Amino acid sequence: MAVPRNRHSNARKNIRRSHHAKKACSGAVCNNCKQVFIPHTVCASCGFYKGKAVVTVEK
């Protein structure tokens, strides 16, 4: 079995994990209502997805 030879310091561990942070999600613009929404999801303001009405939104 693989066993670490020496202990890694907290600084070295944190430097290694510096790229593990969650990235901010880029927004896409809805073609129907021009609102910003999360890509690959239904627009929350109008209910359209890829140019088609998928969900009826109550206003």
Curated annotation (Swiss-Prot):
Give the NCBIfam families listed for this entry. Answer: rpmF_bact (TIGR01031)
- Give an example GO biological process: translation
Which UniProt keywords are given for this protein, alphabetically ordered? Answer: Ribonucleoprotein, Ribosomal protein
Superkingdom: Bacteria
Q: Its Gene Ontology molecular function terms?
A: structural constituent of ribosome
What is the recorded name of this protein? Answer: Large ribosomal subunit protein bL32
* Taxonomic source organism: Chlamydia muridarum (strain MoPn / Nigg)
User: Which InterPro entries did the record assign?
Assistant: Ribosomal_bL32, Ribosomal_bL32_bact, Ribosomal_zn-bd
Segments of this protein annotated with the region Disordered: 1-20
Pfam families the UniProt entry points to: Ribosomal_L32p
In the record, the note on similarity to other proteins reads: Belongs to the bacterial ribosomal protein bL32 family.
Q: Name one GO cellular component term.
A: large ribosomal subunit
